[in-house]
Amino acid sequence: MKRILTAALLLLTGVFASAQQMPPMPVDPAVRIGHLENGLTYYVRHNAEPEGQANFYIAQKVGSILENDDQRGLAHFLEHMCFNGTEHFPGNGIIKYCESIGVKFGADLNAYTSIDETVYNIDNVPVAN
């Protein structure tokens, strides 16, 4: 009886282990993929809707999982700091610029940090200019 249970357990372990391996997700052929010198990989896909607008997502493979116990909240803090100015957009310059072209802070310009990713999104950006 013990041998039968051991064999059944080994069989089930093998079945569950093989079931967890998923094939890679196919890439949409309409997506253009490129790599910058700094290591950033980008994906571009044309969408007809919404007409005259574009949406941008910057996804980074960093999140709270990379924090030590004495760093809790650091990933989320750094996400917020990205809206507090850069060399070319000091202070709230990036927010002011986006609002000047019709992008609303909070609704169209936002970000989030999760366990394993930090994502910045800029939606409804007019592309006429």
Describe each model-derived feature in a short phrase.
Residues 5-7, 19-96, 121-124:
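His/Glu-rich zincin catalytic helix
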Residues 4-5, 13:
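N-terminal targeting leader peptides, primarily classical Sec-type signal peptides for secretion
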Residues 10-18:
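Hydrophobic h-region of N-terminal signal peptides that target proteins for export
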